[in-house]
C-alpha cells in the first residue's frame, strides 16, 4: 500500500496517477494511516503550511521513524520537507531526512511558474513536460545522495544558463523540484515504485 500525505496541497492528483498505474493507495492524515503503508509520497503545496500541519497532526516523529525503514518520495514542497536545514527556511521546519539543502521559491512567485521539456537520463526517463510551480532550487548536496539529474536553465534576459539539480535520490528516498503528477505522465512515479516499493530497479 502506498500512502499519499493528505494534509495540504496536490495529494489528489498523486492518487490519480497511482490509480492509473494500478497501485493500491490511501490518503495519510494520521499515524494510523501511515502505519498501513509501505511507501509514502509527500506532495507539492505550500511548505510553510505543510510543516505546521505535520506538527499539528503529530506526524513528525512518526514520519521520521518511518523514513528509517520505508521509502518516501517528495515533490516540490515535499522536496523541501525532505531536505536538511540547520535553521528554519522561512518558518519551514524541514524533516532532515535526505542530505541536501534547498532555497524555497527560487524561480520566483506563482506567475513565474513554467513547463519545460526535459529528459532524466540517469533515471531512465526520456523526454516529458516537467511542471515547475514556485519550485525550490537545490543549494548543496551531501555524501548520502547517490544519484541526481541536472538540467540547463537560461538566466532571465541572458544567453547564459545555469545547471540546476531537479531530482535526486539516496539509498531509500527520492525528491524532485517539479510536479510529476500534473501532466498525467506516470513514469517518474513508476521509477520510484519500481525501485523503492517493488525493488525492481
Residue ranges and their predicted role:
Residues 25-26, 72, 173:
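Hydrophobic anchor at the start of a short beta-strand
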Residues 1-55, 62-65, 123, 186-201:
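N-terminal beta1-alpha1 cap of cysteine-dependent amidohydrolase-like domains
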Amino acid at each position: 500500500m502506498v500512502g499519499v500525505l493528505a494534509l495540504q496541497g496536490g495529494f489528489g492528483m498523486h492518487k490519480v496517477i497511482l490509480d492509473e498505474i494500478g497501485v493500491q493507495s490511501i490518503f495519510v492524515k494520521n499515524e494510523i494511516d501511515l502505519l498501513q503503508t509501505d511507501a509514502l509520497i509527500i506532495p507539492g503545496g505550500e511548505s510553510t503550511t505543510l510543516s505546521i500541519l505535520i506538527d499539528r497532526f503529530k506526524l513528525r516523529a512518526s514520519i521520521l521513524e518511518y523514513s528509517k525503514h520505508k521509502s518516501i518520495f517528495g515533490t516540490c514542497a515535499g522536496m523541501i520537507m525532505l531536505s536538511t536545514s540547520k535553521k528554519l527556511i522561512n518558518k519551514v521546519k524541514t524533516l532532515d531526512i535526505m542530505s541536501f539543502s534547498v532555497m524555497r521559491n527560487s524561480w520566483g512567485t506563482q506567475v513565474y511558474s513554467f513547463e519545460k521539456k526535459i529528459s532524466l537520463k540517469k533515471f531512465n526517463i526520456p523526454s516529458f513536460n516537467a511542471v515547475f510551480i514556485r519550485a525550490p532550487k537545490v543549494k548543496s548536496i551531501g555524501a548520502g545522495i547517490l544519484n541526481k539529474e541536472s538540467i540547463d536553465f537560461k538566466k532571465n534576459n541572458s544567453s547564459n544558463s545555469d545547471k540546476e539539480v531537479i531530482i535526486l535520490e539516496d539509498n531509500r528516498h527520492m525528491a524532485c523540484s517539479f510536479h510529476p503528477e500534473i501532466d498525467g505522465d506516470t513514469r517518474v512515479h513508476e521509477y520510484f515504485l519500481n525501485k523503492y516499493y517493488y525493488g525492481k530497479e
